[in-house]
Amino acid sequence: MIQSERKLHIEPSPDEGQFKLKIAFTTLDRQHVDQHFGTAKCVLIYGVNEHHWSLLEAIEYPVISDKTHDKLPARIADLSGCAAVYCNACGVSAIRQLLGDNINPVKVSEGVNIHLMLAEIQEELRGAPTGWLNRALKMAEKKKHDQSSDQNRLNKLMDEEW
């Protein structure tokens, strides 16, 4: 499995709990969506909610052959917790694997500005989210509810007499 070359985290780390979603963008120039998912040299991950967004992580990948398929598991693992990845193209195998990990691949035209895409996501969050965004919000809410249920069960277990 081909790992990422570098992962850069923002310090001090923004509180990821303040964001409704994490969204990834494939980019070479770090300003525009301009890469195919499978061959992207860089992925930027942002946290976003209705009122603001923040860069959380930048991931760089080594240059490898286009025919190497064992790169996908590491790339998808790097996107863990992301609701979507914006890219110019994405292969069928990658789409299947991304969807299996509840990450929506979103194809956009080459050169789309990342900050404009974040503003559009925020606008939709303030309104009535549809499509993948609506599904991602429901999934995030369910995950949060499941985690709080697990914590409640653990607290009850700890309160029991042994």
Question: Where does each model-flagged region fall?
Answer:
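Mid-chain, well-packed structural core segment of small domains
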Residues: A77-V108
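Non-catalytic interface/targeting segments
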Residues: M1-I76, V106, V112-W162
